[in-house]
Amino acid sequence: MAFNLKNFKVIVQMGKSRGDQSANGSTNGHAVSLKEGIQGFLQNAGVGNSSKFVLDEKVMAKLPSDFREQAEQFRHLGAYVSKLPVEEIGIPEYLGFVSRGSDTQQKRNLVYPVGGGVFIHVVHDPEDTRDYYLAVEPSLAPGVEEIVNDIDVQLMDYIDELRAADGSEERLEVILNAVDEICGRADSSSKKVSKSVDLTDDQFQAIKYLMRREKAGMGVMDPLVEDPYIEDISCSGVGPLYIEHKIFGGLKASIEFSDSEELDQYVIQLSEKIGRPVTIREPIVDSTLPDGSRINIVYGGDVSRRGSNFTIRKFSATPLSILDLIKFGTLTYEMAAYISLMLSEGMNTFVSGETAS
């Protein structure tokens, strides 16, 4: 298969809402995005012909020991790497930990973990100044999209338990326990399960991941929100999401909105997730995510020439100190001393600059 970086593109297919509702009250139209790029690439390369991931022993043997260990433990990563055109782009460098000194490659081709079985592949795009940022998720398991729809229907039988749950974490626990029962992975005599869903281990882990991502997380954007190295996520309209990365600078995500209808629908669903729904009467929303990140959402073309858009500005779990800023080259010791004097004297100050500068 000829390698084309555009094969990795993930078009966010919100799908047409069927008008039905999932067990947590949300519409099923966006429960699972159709990863036409990455998943299609894997399927066309042979991974999707079975119900489990296929690992290429020759490629696996070429991986460094730490990378191979991760690829064997997280089989979706192994399958992903197995189908990469390594003869053309080479074996990705595996970084167990990303630091300021990690950006050493002239043509980036590296993988790092962000937790929860999610890995990020940063790969050079010779046609653009921004390289690709690709999320390798457990949900790449073949055949899971149809299975999710079946499970969503059966989750309706657990509506009473979900209503009785106290808070989002308890609701997620109810959903995951229900999935265990539906998939025959729990010892239960429950009569709620009308038809047990038969899954491989790869598919089961993918389903559990998707349930966490879609029911409690940020959906298709969840890997970006969970990545501690991302400072800014922006969608300026139809087209790809853009990222400001703490280490690798400006990148473009493998998530793209192909038309304004898809984007409008996603913006509405995103605003509902944070409890501040946008409407025609209230098209602009400023809010915060559970982790403290700021989010700005603009809905529709009446208030924005490019239509709906949104920006997520993330915050570091550990705030940067003044010494960190000096180390990173943001300012000099003399500048830091001058700022200290201004603050001690109660002078008015302002700081300006572009995002992620």
Stretches with model-predicted labels:
Residues 2-274:
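N-terminal accessory targeting/assembly segments
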Residues 351:
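Hydrophobic anchor at the beta1->P-loop junction of P-loop NTPases
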Residues 354-355:
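The conserved Walker
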Residues 235-236, 240-348:
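P-loop NTP-binding catalytic core
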